[in-house]
Protein backbone atom coordinates (compact mmCIF):
# COMPACT_ATOMS: atom_id res chain seq x y z
CA UNK A 1 0.00 0.00 0.00
CA UNK A 2 2.72 2.45 1.01
CA UNK A 3 4.89 1.67 -2.02
CA UNK A 4 1.92 2.15 -4.37
CA UNK A 5 1.20 5.53 -2.78
CA UNK A 6 4.87 6.56 -3.07
CA UNK A 7 4.98 5.58 -6.75
CA UNK A 8 1.74 7.50 -7.35
CA UNK A 9 3.11 10.63 -5.66
CA UNK A 10 6.34 10.46 -7.69
CA UNK A 11 4.34 10.07 -10.92
CA UNK A 12 2.14 12.97 -9.87
CA UNK A 13 5.18 15.18 -9.27
CA UNK A 14 6.57 14.26 -12.69
CA UNK A 15 3.26 15.09 -14.42
CA UNK A 16 3.09 18.35 -12.48
CA UNK A 17 6.63 19.39 -13.42
CA UNK A 18 6.10 18.53 -17.09
CA UNK A 19 2.77 20.37 -17.18
CA UNK A 20 4.16 23.51 -15.55
CA UNK A 21 7.14 23.51 -17.94
CA UNK A 22 4.81 23.13 -20.94
CA UNK A 23 2.50 25.89 -19.72
CA UNK A 24 5.40 28.23 -19.02
CA UNK A 25 6.67 27.73 -22.56
CA UNK A 26 3.28 28.56 -24.08
CA UNK A 27 1.99 31.13 -21.61
CA UNK A 28 4.28 32.05 -18.70
CA UNK A 29 1.69 33.35 -16.26
CA UNK A 30 1.59 32.91 -12.50
CA UNK A 31 -2.13 32.22 -12.75
CA UNK A 32 -1.53 28.97 -14.66
CA UNK A 33 1.00 27.78 -12.10
CA UNK A 34 -1.39 28.67 -9.27
CA UNK A 35 -4.19 26.62 -10.86
CA UNK A 36 -1.87 23.62 -11.23
CA UNK A 37 -0.79 23.93 -7.58
CA UNK A 38 -4.43 23.96 -6.50
CA UNK A 39 -5.19 20.91 -8.65
CA UNK A 40 -2.19 19.08 -7.16
CA UNK A 41 -3.27 19.97 -3.59
CA UNK A 42 -6.79 18.75 -4.35
CA UNK A 43 -5.36 15.49 -5.71
CA UNK A 44 -3.24 14.90 -2.62
CA UNK A 45 -6.10 15.75 -0.26
CA UNK A 46 -8.46 13.31 -1.93
CA UNK A 47 -5.69 10.77 -2.62
CA UNK A 48 -7.28 10.44 -6.04
CA UNK A 49 -4.03 9.92 -7.91
CA UNK A 50 -5.63 8.11 -10.84
CA UNK A 51 -7.97 10.98 -11.65
CA UNK A 52 -5.19 13.55 -11.33
CA UNK A 53 -2.78 11.60 -13.54
CA UNK A 54 -5.50 11.11 -16.17
CA UNK A 55 -6.25 14.83 -15.98
CA UNK A 56 -2.59 15.73 -16.50
CA UNK A 57 -2.26 13.37 -19.47
CA UNK A 58 -5.37 14.82 -21.15
CA UNK A 59 -4.48 18.45 -20.37
Swiss-Prot record:
Expressed by the venom gland. The keyword Disulfide bond does not apply. Coiled coil: none annotated. Its main location: secreted. One of its GO terms (cellular component) is extracellular region. The keyword Secreted applies. This is Venom protein 37.1. Belongs to the non-disulfide-bridged peptide (NDBP) superfamily. Long chain multifunctional peptide (group 2) family. The lineage of its organism: Eukaryota, Metazoa, Ecdysozoa, Arthropoda, Chelicerata. It comes from Lychas mucronatus. It is found in: Secreted. Keywords: Secreted, Signal.
Amino acid sequence: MVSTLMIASVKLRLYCTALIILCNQKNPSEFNVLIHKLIIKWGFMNKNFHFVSVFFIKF
